[in-house]
UniProtKB/Swiss-Prot annotation:
This is Na(+)/H(+) antiporter subunit D1. The chain crosses the membrane at residues 5-25, 34-54, 72-92, 109-129, 131-151, 174-194, 211-231, 232-252, 277-297, 303-323, 331-351, 370-390, 407-427, 457-477. NCBIfam families: PRK07691.1. The lineage of its organism: Bacteria, Bacillati, Bacillota, Bacilli, Bacillales. The gene is mnhD1. It is found in: Cell membrane. Belongs to the CPA3 antiporters (TC 2.A.63) subunit D family. GO terms for molecular function: antiporter activity; NADH dehydrogenase (ubiquinone) activity. The keyword Cell membrane applies. GO terms for biological process: ATP synthesis coupled electron transport; sodium ion transport. Mnh complex is a Na(+)/H(+) antiporter involved in Na(+) excretion. InterPro entries: CPA3_Na-H_Antiporter_D, NADH_UbQ_OxRdtase, ND/Mrp_TM. May form a heterooligomeric complex that consists of seven subunits: mnhA1, mnhB1, mnhC1, mnhD1, mnhE1, mnhF1 and mnhG1. It is a multi-pass membrane protein. The keyword Membrane applies.
Amino acid sequence: MIESNLLVLTLVIPILTAILLIFIGKRPIIKRYVALVGTLLTLVIALINLKNVLRDGPIKVELGSWKAPYSIVFVVDIFSALLIITSIIITILVILYSYRSIGLDRERHYYYFSIMFMLIGIIGSFTTGDIFNLFVFFEVFLMSSYCLLVIGTTKIQLQETIKYILVNVVSSSFFVMGVAVLYSVVGTLNLAHISERLSQLSVHDSGLVNIVFILFIFVFATKAGVFPMYVWLPGAYYAPPVAIITFFGALLTKVGVYAIARTLSLFFNNTVSFSHYVILFLALLTIIFGCIGAIAYYDTKKIILYNIMIAVGVILVGIAMMNESGMTGAIYYTLHDMLVKASLFLLIGVMYKITKTTDLRHFGGLIKGYPILGWTFFIAALSLAGIPPFSGFYGKFYIVRATFEKGFYLSGIIVLLSSLIVLYSVIRIFLKGFFGEVEGYTLSKKVNVKYLTTIAVASTVITVIFGLSADTLFPIIKDGAETFVDPSQYIHSVLGGK
């Protein structure tokens, strides 16, 4: 009972924090600390939840005094617990970074409120046990993201927000259609119950299941920024301030990735044989087009944004394999990418603060005035590229191993080659931005970026610790992968369990 209450608290605390932020009014200093304390409390509860999951297996809570599959169910397993903890850590870093970067005008209004509600939507998406509430939590974090995109009301923000809203309204409509078709086939919305019902379907209903798969893959691939539904991502994520880009780039696409992994495991593991091939095909195209974008631009933000696409593609290759190696690599690489992308965006934000530009052709020589910033970026770049012993190596190694175990040798080779493109793209930023002639800033008039650099360095240190802790983490992550490869444990914990 206590464990169930703790699971609910990961949603209740951010909700109460958001409500309190409304009543505080236009007092940004107080809002800063309320948002920070609320997020720290949520992190403590999330860590306790992880400890309970490691001890007892997946934990569920049923709301409304009804039993599953008729109740509203929230479930946390190892993967969702790790995603929640990582999301909260990144939220804390973004809040701290915002103190000196986002501006008092934004802070006075609904900035921290929107961050809290986006965190609610993300945590809810990772823990909900039914498909309709997944839609609800998607809408919660999407509406919060709309608010964050327009805060500041610059022309480019408004332009990109309109596109972003349009794309997501269309995908949300398809989501509702998919839920309706699925319910007409199986008569339930509970994820675990849907899995059981789909395994009992006759061949006659397989056509409708194919339609459901197409609808869901369109929706989740759009959220994750998968080719060809990625077109909104570079513009929408480029427009807002760096603190918001960090929040979006590190977290939002991973919600779509998680939804693909969970539904593929529960709904389509055995029912739709071509589903894994479709996801693999889209994943490889996403990697290829992400690589093209990463080397085509001189803008530092766009280079990292296209690296988001590459990472999403690599993760989906592991998910498409749906074996122990593939899912272990996908889980580890997802957590790694969330942390390292946050680090890189925060570092680029510091570089922008100094030079007032993100165009590599217009600045250089930063290492002379800001050596700590430069070498921290170098470490984050190596981690992103997957150079051992940093965290990017281990997840990618398991994903490539999974492709070879399944006989998808070309897929494994594409993943390996993408590492070279990633390394080239980020080392280009390092060499052009930090070496060469001093340009874009005055060496004798250094900009005070100590606070922002400290937050960015802290973020990178967390990434490095994550990589160096691989031996400790992998047994845990392998247990989390088993829930996807063999979802019976998840199903039992929801329908038969605790």
